[in-house]
A protein has these predicted regions:
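Extended C-terminal subregions enriched in glycine
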Residues: 147-164
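Juxtamembrane inter-helical linkers in multi-pass membrane proteins
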Residues: 15-18, 22-25, 58-63, 106-137, ...
Length: 234
């Protein structure tokens, strides 16, 4: 919303908004994935215009976690489905009402990964992770990595729990857990754009509901309810 506020204004404000590193990451991911999916699904839709239209709408919907779909991407080639699957983790920018891990966390995790690889070859060199022009302290990087670990662990645990019903394959269960934690909307196959979650039993629906709440609250508030030490008065 901060970026939206700066975009509504003079030409100088628009130029300032473009300087936002998070916005550049967001647009970069959107354009790159849209172009890649367009090429993958081009044989399926015949013309570049049609392929681009379907690809851009689905990518925008997934990244903004709006939940709309104009095509059943469960029927797209594997490469396109893999890209959609990865987008479900990402979400939109920090401060937005969208779900997902958020662009800022993805960017910092990427930069931390690059720094770790470089440190392997240059152990004596001091390397600082920078985001939005400022150095990011190691405490924040550890917290970001911890959030990512909990995020992925919750998805995997949720997928395993709902798999005990034995109704759907691994792709359906994993995408169902992921789309609930990220609050995306549709998943793949039976829970894809042409389907819904009605086929799951009561137990799975409770698990998926808890995953949705956890994702909407950014995980930790829900986990705090399971941590008895926080219940006591200090």
């Amino acid at each position: 919303y901060d970026i939206h506020e700066r975009l509504v204004g003079s030409e100088m404000c628009i130029r300032d908004s473009v300087k936002s590193e998070e916005l550049r990451w967001y647009l970069g991911i959107f354009l790159t994935v849209t172009a890649a999916i367009t090429m993958v699904i081009l044989p399926q839709y015949g013309t570049v215009g049609n392929a681009l239209r379907y690809a851009s709408f689905q990518v925008a919907s997934i990244m903004s976690t709006t939940g709309y779909a104009t095509a059943d991407f469960s029927l797209w080639p594997v490469a396109a489905r893999m890209l959609i699957f990865m987008l479900m983790f990402i979400g939109a920018c920090a401060g937005s009402t969208a779900g997902g891990m958020k662009i800022c966390r993805i960017a910092m995790l990427w930069k931390q990964g690059v720094r770790s690889v470089r440190h392997t070859f240059q152990p004596r060199k001091v390397q600082v992770v920078r985001f939005e022009g400022k150095g990011v302290d190691d405490t924040l990087l550890r917290e970001t990595a911890s959030f990512a670990f909990v995020y992925i662990a919750m998805i995997l645990i949720g997928a395993v729990l709902i798999a005990f019903e034995g109704k759907y394959d691994i792709e359906t269960n994993l995408s169902a857990a992921l789309t609930c934690v990220s609050n995306v909307g549709p998943g793949f196959n039976a829970v894809g754009p042409a389907g819904n979650f009605a086929g799951y039993g009561s137990f799975a629906k409770v698990v998926l509901s808890l995953l949705m709440l956890a994702g909407r609250l950014e995980l930790y508030p829900m986990l705090a309810l399971l941590y008895p030490a926080l219940w006591r008065k200090q």
